[in-house]
Each structure stands twice: as C-alpha cells, then as structure tokens.
Amino acid sequence: MRCPYCGSLETQVKDSRPTDDASAIRRRRVCPDCGGRFTTFERVQLRELTVLKKSGRRAPFEREKLMRSLEIALRKRPVEPERVERMVNGIVRQLESQGESEIASDRIGELVMEGLRALDSVAYVRFASVYRNFREARDFNALIDELDGAAQPEAPSKDDGGTDEPPAKTRAPTRA
C-alpha cells in the first residue's frame, strides 16, 4: 500500500481488526521510510457499481463520495459516526444486492433521503435542499410540512368534531 505522506510503496501493517459491525477490516499501517502512520479499511465488494448520472454520463460508484455528502449534511449534528457508517453500509448493500451494475443517481439520492429522514431531520432537510435543488423558501416549507405531517398523530375524524381543514400551523416568518 502506498504511503499517503511520502509515496513509498513499502508500508507495514501494525494492527488489524474487524470493524464494530464486521463489515470491514481496519488496518493500522506505518511507513518505514518516513514513519508516517495511517489507517486503511478493507471491504468486500460484491460487484463494480456504475452511477448513471442525470446527464447520461456514467461514473464509478464512490463510497467515499457518499460518505462525504452525508458528513456535509450532518455537520455539527449530534449523530454518532458509527450510525452514519451503518447507514452507508446499508445503502451500499442495497445497491449491490439489486443485481444491477448500473444505478441511477436518483436511486442513490432516494436511499440517502430515506436514511437521513430516520437518522436526523435537520440533516434530511439540508440534504434535500441540495438534492432537490431548492430555489425558494417555500420549497423548504413544503418539505418541513411533509416531515411534520409524517410525525403528527392521526387527525381527528369528522365524528370527533374534526373538519376537512388541515390544522393551522404557526411558523415564524421566513426571509426570502
């Protein structure tokens, strides 16, 4: 394995152990040339996945790119890295087990949205704003209303004195 510090091809494994969820092997390495220490992860790859972009272009699937986009959405949020890792592992497993070598970028985005919705609602809104290309404040309001609707208990029926009108929402004014 090439040393990320000096480029030497001679590195030594000092420690090797499975990750907590046993989906990868974590190896601690040292470079004898510069003394640099770094960690690598070895994972099973069931198949080479290709992402079919909206433009029609094809690109190799990059697990690290998926992880980076989640880290951006989850920045400064109280979510343990292990939960994010489990989510990414689950998404990759779903993609690999679909039996297709080409996956539409939309499918990946929907899986991420699904996972973030269960993980952290703020990160979900952050990711959705980029993924769905929000242009105005009302785009955020619609998504938040959708989130609120999924989290609210069932509305009272007409027999209970309820109406067909949705409950009034009080929200601070938004700045456009």
Curated annotation (Swiss-Prot):
Single GO MF descriptor: zinc ion binding
Cofactor(s) essential for the protein: Zn(2+)
Protein name: Transcriptional repressor NrdR
GO biological process entries: negative regulation of DNA-templated transcription
Similarity section: Belongs to the NrdR family.
Organism, scientific name: Methylocella silvestris (strain DSM 15510 / CIP 108128 / LMG 27833 / NCIMB 13906 / BL2)
Keywords linked to the UniProt accession: ATP-binding, DNA-binding, Metal-binding, Nucleotide-binding, Repressor, Transcription, Transcription regulation, Zinc, Zinc-finger
PROSITE patterns per UniProt: ATP_CONE
Residue ranges occupied by any ATP-cone domain in the UniProt entry: 49-139
Annotated region described as Disordered, given as residue ranges: 147-176
Gene label: nrdR
Cited Pfam families: ATP-cone, Zn_ribbon_NrdR
Cofactor annotation remark: Binds 1 zinc ion.
Biological role stated in the UniProt entry: Negatively regulates transcription of bacterial ribonucleotide reductase nrd genes and operons by binding to NrdR-boxes.
